[in-house]
Amino acid sequence: MGRQGLIHIVILQYKLGGIYPMKAVDIRQMYLEFFKEKGHHHEPSAPLVPINDPSLLWINSGVATLKPYFDGRVIPDNPRITNAQKSIRTNDIENVGKTARHHTFFEMLGNFSIGDYFKKEAIHYAWEFLTDKKWMGFDPELLSITIHPEDQEAYDVWHQEIGIPEERLIRLEGNFWDIGEGPSGPNSEIFYDRGVEYGSDENDPEMYPGGENERYLEIWNLVFSQFNHNPDGTYTPLPKQNIDTGMGLERIVSVVQNVPTNFDTDLFMPIIEKIEEFANRKYKRPSEVDLNEIFGSEEDINTPFKVIADHIRTVAFAIGDGALPSNEGRGYVLRRLLRRAVRYAKQIGIEKPFMFELVPTVGKIMEDFYPEVTEKCEFIQRVIKNEEIRFHETLDGGLAIFNEVAESQKAAGHDFIPGADAFRLYDTYGFPIELTEEYAEEVGMKVDHEGFETAMEEQRERARAARQDVDSMQVQNEVLANLTVASEFVGFDTLVANTEIAAMIVNGQVEKVASEGQEALVILAKTPFYAEMGGQIADSGIISNDSFTAVVKDVQKAPNGQPLHTVIVESGEMHVEDAVQAIVHRDDRNLIIKNHTATHIMQRALKDVLGDHVNQAGSYVGPDRLRFDFSHFGQVTKEELQQIERIVNEKVWDDIEVVIEEMAIDQAKAKGAMALFGEKYGDVVRVVSIGDYSIELCGGIHVKRSSEIGFFKIVSEGGIGAGTRRIEAVTGKVAYEVVKEEEALLNDAAALLKANPKDIVTKVQALQGDYKELQRDNEALSQKIANAHSWGNCRCSTNNWRCHSSFYKSRSKDNNLLRQMMDDLKALMPKAVIVLGAVDGDLSDAMCRGITIINRWQLPCWKYREIWCQKLVVVIGGVRPDMAMAGAKDASKLDEALLSVYDYVKSI
């Protein structure tokens, strides 16, 4: 049996007596099940918007969410991890739709070892999954391997243990994974031979696994993380070697379903079929297209369908995970993707908003593993539809910019559109270079392609530099990672603990003693101090005995989970194994727990008032206030804030019991517990219930009953970024003090207005009415004075060559009055040069108008303004063919400026 026949048998399964290609959902599940059988913990996919990682714009790989494990900041419960992680990358956006496999949204299947197994096991696992008939069942002869030239260990495993012949083991210098500081190492890539129909030219220097060709498709990358890339550029062996692998789901599905591109798989085709309902033509199926047409680098007849299908997946999932379109950051990425998709939609006859109607299809394809798009479908659709409508306006604005640039270039004697402007139209307004070329051709111009490519490459360089900066992991800290002494947190029940010092780090090294004035990191055998987590700040307090006193400045979680106290030794010497007393500051703790419980109630109230799309985007819970960042598309009205505040206070006054329980994660979810979006949880979780109103997974500390909060007061609310808003509030004593401060301000205002506090609004409204009436009287009087002076001055006009010239200076402060005077004088003298000057303190303003001279000679108004400006240090104002304005700070030369225009009129 030939290779092609074997491939078809491998990728087909039997179902109800029929044969069908394995679906993407089956392949994803099969991968995860395989590694769970190998003892791996399945880590759920994190949201695309990074949580607690400001270095990343998007989650862009399977390993991105595991960085704390790889750099040693956190020790996982199970060192073997597997995941299917949704990811976004937009560095090659211009290639999406033109190639078979470029995407902005994709899924990465991965298996990871944090200091457990290494190369041998990773290679054997990969080979078993790909070739065993129980799993993928690929023909081993269709698989080739690339390795780093110096990675003899990997070569020996592949060649001697797996049995890969030398001709299918290719050594490549590029097989080394390194993104800057942090873990790095060689890698092995596995390639699948798709057959001679995808390439058979023996003279093609790129026709080999790892070359630029379509025949040999990379399906899996195994990274052997064995070095630390240090800040000084050197490499040292990692304390613990790691495994990081990645298999693109879209790629492996295209192989299994035997289709030429990722877009022809069941991950994309339902979306493409939905697009066809709106388009004026159909997508060309693989049987209708020659492979040479598919695998070019240029656009083909299917490009618009591919672009739209890819981009709607990205945008729908990103919005579902909390991102919103904007002009900056990740919001700008979404806006750019939507613009690009809508622009391509026009090529297939779609002229109206339609992208939002694709969202249910995206959700349906992915809902078995990613239910969030379906769950938030209505909200996602609303956001996308609004953005589509706005884009059509943006497109018109881009055309206006093009016209301005074209006119400016022609006026300067040029016949081309500068590359920088063409790139601005491309990058900001979504104009493809081809569209700009078409517009340029219509007005007899060309486009500076070299300048455009230069600007494009500069952007790519900035993106590459940014990726190198944001992807790097921290260098592993071996000292902290090796601290495995036990520490028990007892702070849920007490603020004081008699304990002992279990371990100590001074100046980055494990020590036995810390002296007066030194800072140390301390682990206690048991501690009442809460380590900062979930927005709740760390406790402060004292650790002491008869020999020393140390102030606790901060408490964080060590890599192995123990509370790690940062302390300053104020007096004496602190020794490991000292018996000590640890005391938390009671007043601060009491204020913190009131704010924490209030935050839970407020989050539920936000969802009730604004909608279930509200998700936590950040928080701070301290003794002074609570701060809560949340996702929301639009403003929060005054009435909504009042409603939220009222709901929280009602729950406070209801004196609800706060119940804290530990239970299985599935039980908590069944109970309706709200989880922090994107947070990782173990099999057993802590559930905080405030009656049946608020149920959340939370490891923080809370009041016993809601009435202990006392009083809740919102002090501010506003936007802090695209689609993200922030509420700050206070509780208890602090809330009372805020109210008293506002009351004092109200009383001061009432005293100034000579009114009772309850009558302030009425008093201010009356004053505003009086002020508006005075304004109207003042404007009417000013107009009368100006008119009187105007008519008087007109009788002193100069007649020169049948052209009247009128000059006038007043003390009007209002440009509108000058314009009104100009209109009146224009009606009186239709063939006149009129110059008006107004003085306001040390400022002067002028308006001039040029009209027909000798019935056939028309002078533009800017010429008169030019004469005027020669006499004054001016700030140029607006200009029209029949009117111009200018302003100056020195009013002393106003008379001279007026006369200079008069002299010019006489001279012509």
Curated annotation (Swiss-Prot):
Binding-site residues for Zn(2+), renumbered to this chain: 596, 600, 698, 702
Biological process per Gene Ontology, one example term: alanyl-tRNA aminoacylation
GO terms, molecular function: alanine-tRNA ligase activity; aminoacyl-tRNA deacylase activity; ATP binding; catalytic activity, acting on a protein; transferase activity; tRNA binding; zinc ion binding
A GO cellular component entry from the record: cytosol
Catalytic reactions of this protein: tRNA(Ala) + L-alanine + ATP = L-alanyl-tRNA(Ala) + AMP + diphosphate
Cofactor(s), by name: Zn(2+)
SMART domains: tRNA_SAD
Cofactor note: Binds 1 zinc ion per subunit.
One Pfam family it belongs to: tRNA_SAD
Keyword annotations of the record: Aminoacyl-tRNA synthetase, ATP-binding, Cytoplasm, Ligase, Metal-binding, Nucleotide-binding, Protein biosynthesis, RNA-binding, tRNA-binding, Zinc
Enzyme category, top tier: ligase
Compartments it resides in: Cytoplasm
EC number: 6.1.1.7
Biological function: Catalyzes the attachment of alanine to tRNA(Ala) in a two-step reaction: alanine is first activated by ATP to form Ala-AMP and then transferred to the acceptor end of tRNA(Ala). Also edits incorrectly charged Ser-tRNA(Ala) and Gly-tRNA(Ala) via its editing domain.
Domain notes: Consists of three domains; the N-terminal catalytic domain, the editing domain and the C-terminal C-Ala domain. The editing domain removes incorrectly charged amino acids, while the C-Ala domain, along with tRNA(Ala), serves as a bridge to cooperatively bring together the editing and aminoacylation centers thus stimulating deacylation of misacylated tRNAs.
Family: Belongs to the class-II aminoacyl-tRNA synthetase family.
Name of this protein: Alanine--tRNA ligase
Organism annotation: Lysinibacillus sphaericus (strain C3-41)
Lineage: Bacteria, Bacillati, Bacillota, Bacilli, Bacillales
